[in-house]
């Protein structure tokens, strides 16, 4: 599981029709029209909504002034390296021990925009599902397969 924060990410996840999400909503934010829209669409996708008090939300959130909505998203299944080599078609971006999470997220975002088939990360690279990578990918982490911890 990994965390995604904010209304835009919630909308991106819903637009991709990803189901079975746990959505934490800060108390008092549910009245917001945008959050109501997330509730309506999320119910159709079997999302579980939990209201969370502000102190707990601050503890969970990685941002100083969050929007009061956090998603717990299941990491997609990714083939292991031998399977990957047999089925590797298209254009891929290879990151060899890129450790800066902001750079990894930006490269994932660029790879998605360029129409790449996936991103490969070798051992020693930043965790693609860390808070900073997910945030800097701006939702692109959901748009293409990410193969990580590869020993090439």
Residue ranges and their predicted role:
Residues 1-66:
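N-terminal positively charged helical leader segments and presequences
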Residues 8, 15, 30, 44, ...:
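RNA substrate-binding interface of SAM-dependent RNA methyltransferases
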């Amino acid at each position: 599981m990994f965390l995604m924060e904010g209304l835009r990410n919630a909308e991106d996840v819903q637009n991709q029709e990803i189901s079975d999400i746990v959505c934490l909503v800060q108390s008092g934010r549910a009245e917001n029209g945008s959050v109501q829209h997330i509730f309506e669409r999320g119910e159709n996708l079997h999302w579980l909504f939990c209201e969370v008090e502000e102190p707990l939300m601050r503890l969970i959130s990685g941002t100083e002034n969050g929007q009061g909505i956090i998603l717990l998203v299941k990491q997609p299944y990714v083939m292991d390296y031998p399977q990957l080599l047999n089925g590797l078609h298209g254009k891929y971006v290879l990151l060899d021990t890129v450790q800066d999470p902001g750079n990894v997220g930006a490269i994932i975002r660029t790879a998605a925009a360029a129409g790449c088939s996936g991103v490969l990360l070798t051992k020693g690279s930043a965790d693609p599902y860390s808070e900073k990578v997910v945030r800097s990918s701006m939702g692109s982490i959901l748009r293409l397969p990410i193969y990580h911890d590869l020993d090439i």
